[in-house]
């Protein structure tokens, strides 16, 4: 265990421009990718084939996905597994490309088996693929096509942080023309959410099932409960629309959304923070807190909403407590000490009263990474904890000894609670690779020409790693750590290449900023 707070606080962020040697060819070839894809193909019956069938998976991923190698075989295998499964969900429709959530058709889906629940996760994950047109089609599908010809709402069938995700996608693959094209639709959609879900007190309400989190301890299918989820999402969306508007010179719109974000932030901190529990909790429709800690209480950090102080950071103590969220197989969706924890049945519905949901795990890990990266007050949290929980999350991707991602799991045994229901296989309802690229390795997308990297790898955890073939700002980025210099033979330390040119070299694995040209 290291004192990561001290490590982060004392790390020097240096801006360097170094004239280095040209990288003659990719340092990490595709041999490892090929090995993994062949293995994954060999254990798959491929009951459903979409745009990229298994036989084309290796070629497509070679062209599209960043390559990754590290000493942690669990993280490494799962990284390639999650790209392999994500690829399965790419569907070409008459209205453009989309990504599905379920591999099998489900009754509650819209056109082409589309579901908006995990849209934000899909965009965060897919922004690292080389061809961004898939996501642009997908975003426009939801803005312009998803509700056409439907008997009920599809886009607003679930809460969404789509505006935030659109902006985060832009930071990786800049395209102001695309933002300008869709900004009127994003603005209109935000107003629609306000008309449908904003109360007179300024907070947003949501049924837990419309958060994709039914049968929760604090939730309801009828009551207008004010949940940390939708309020955090709407804050994140307002912040993103402010930034997009500034980028496009839309001053009045920027001011409008800046004011909205400021108002929501204050309301969340004033109304959803339970001082006695030191946690963000659901506010009941009839008033007062739901008096239960749930993983959704970490969601405000996904959007850097809470103030940077020790009082709010204390919420994260619950990650370490076995009566809180810490369980043998991962992080629970509700505190284990609650008397009604895991009492709403198993497998017959989609219970969110404590079982492990990858949807929530990836949200919580993103929030923790933001705390460690963007805040000064970390409470008891450090890079070791982030790494351990990310590793556990990766290790949970297993069923009958083989790689698997499903809907939700028992927190003690790891049993997938939908059993062998074919709809659950390859469930595309969470992120993983974004957590590796954006958070563990720490590529921090920006609008300018500075490449920023903020690793959350604990000191002395790894002697080497490489993240290669990262498509960023129209360039190809490689980040390499070689403690001894003998793994990749490019010299000792942390090295960064852009389009084959070395732009940074340092002896320590620490945060850095470097000009890309």
PLM feature spans:
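Bacterial Sec-dependent N-terminal signal peptides
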Residues: 1-25
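Acidic/polar, glycine-enriched structural segments that form the non-catalytic walls/loops
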Residues: 22-110, 171, 176-178, 187-192, ...
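The feature captures the catalytic groove of carbohydrate-active enzymes
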Residues: 25-49, 56-59, 148-160, 191-260, ...
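Well-ordered alpha-helical scaffold segments within catalytic/enzyme domains
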Residues: 61-73, 120-131, 162-178, 232-251, ...
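Extended glycan-interaction surfaces of carbohydrate-active proteins
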Residues: 73-111, 128-152, 195-226, 266-356, ...
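Alpha-helical scaffold segments in carbohydrate-active enzymes
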Residues: 81-88, 141, 168, 185-196, ...
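Non-catalytic carbohydrate-binding regions of carbohydrate-active enzymes
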Residues: 248-284, 313-475
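Carbohydrate-binding surface patches
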Residues: 461-499
């Amino acid at each position: 265990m290291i004192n990561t707070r001290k490590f982060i606080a004392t790390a020097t962020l240096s801006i360097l421009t170094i004239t280095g040697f040209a990288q003659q060819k990719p340092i990490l070839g595709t041999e490892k990718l090929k090995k993994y894809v062949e293995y994954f193909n060999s254990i798959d019956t491929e009951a459903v084939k979409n745009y990229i069938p298994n036989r084309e998976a290796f070629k497509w991923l070679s062209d599209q996905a960043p390559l990754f190698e590290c000493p942690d075989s669990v993280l490494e295998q799962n990284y390639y597994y999650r790209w392999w499964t994500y690829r399965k969900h790419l569907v070409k429709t008459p209205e453009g490309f989309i990504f599905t959530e379920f591999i099998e058709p489900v009754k509650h889906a819209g056109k082409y088996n589309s579901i908006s629940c995990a849209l934000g996760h899909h965009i965060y994950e897919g922004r690292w693929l080389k061809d961004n047109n898939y996501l642009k089609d997908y975003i426009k599908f939801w803005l312009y096509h998803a509700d056409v010809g439907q008997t009920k709402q599809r886009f607003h069938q679930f809460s969404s942080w789509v505006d935030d995700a659109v902006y985060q996608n832009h930071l990786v693959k800049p395209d102001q023309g695309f933002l300008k094209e869709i900004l009127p639709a994003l603005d209109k959609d935000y107003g629609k959410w306000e008309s449908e879900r904003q109360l007179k007190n300024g907070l947003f309400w949501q049924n837990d099932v419309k958060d994709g989190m039914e049968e929760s301890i604090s939730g309801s299918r009828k009551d207008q409960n004010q949940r940390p989820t939708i309020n955090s999402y709407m804050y994140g969306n307002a912040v993103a629309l402010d930034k997009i508007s500034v980028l496009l010179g839309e001053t009045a719109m920027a001011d409008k959304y800046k004011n909205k974000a400021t108002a929501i932030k204050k309301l969340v901190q004033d109304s959803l923070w339970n001082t006695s529990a030191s946690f963000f909790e659901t506010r009941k429709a009839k008033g007062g807190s739901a008096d239960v800690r749930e993983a959704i209480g970490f969601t405000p950090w996904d959007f850097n909403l809470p103030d940077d102080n020790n009082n709010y950071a204390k919420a994260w103590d619950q990650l370490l407590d076995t009566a809180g969220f810490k369980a043998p197989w991962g992080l629970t969706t509700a505190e284990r000490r609650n008397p009604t924890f895991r009492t709403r049945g198993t497998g017959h519905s989609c219970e969110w009263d404590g079982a492990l949901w990858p949807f929530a795990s990836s949200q919580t890990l993103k929030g923790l990474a933001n705390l460690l990266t963007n805040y000064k007050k970390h409470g008891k949290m450090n890079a070791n904890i982030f790494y351990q929980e990310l590793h556990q999350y990766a290790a949970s991707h297993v069923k009958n000894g083989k790689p698997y991602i499903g809907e939700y799991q028992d927190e003690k045994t790891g049993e997938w609670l939908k059993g062998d229901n074919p709809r659950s296989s390859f469930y595309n309802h969470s992120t993983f690779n974004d957590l590796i690229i954006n958070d563990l390795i720490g590529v921090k997308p920006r609008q300018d020409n500075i490449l920023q990297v903020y690793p959350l790898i604990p000191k002395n955890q790894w002697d080497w790693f490489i993240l290669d073939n990262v498509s960023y700002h129209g360039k190809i980025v490689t980040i390499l750590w070689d403690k001894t210099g003998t793994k990749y033979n490019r010299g000792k330390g942390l090295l960064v290449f852009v389009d084959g040119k070395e732009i940074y070299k340092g002896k320590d694995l620490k945060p850095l900023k470097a000009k890309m040209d």
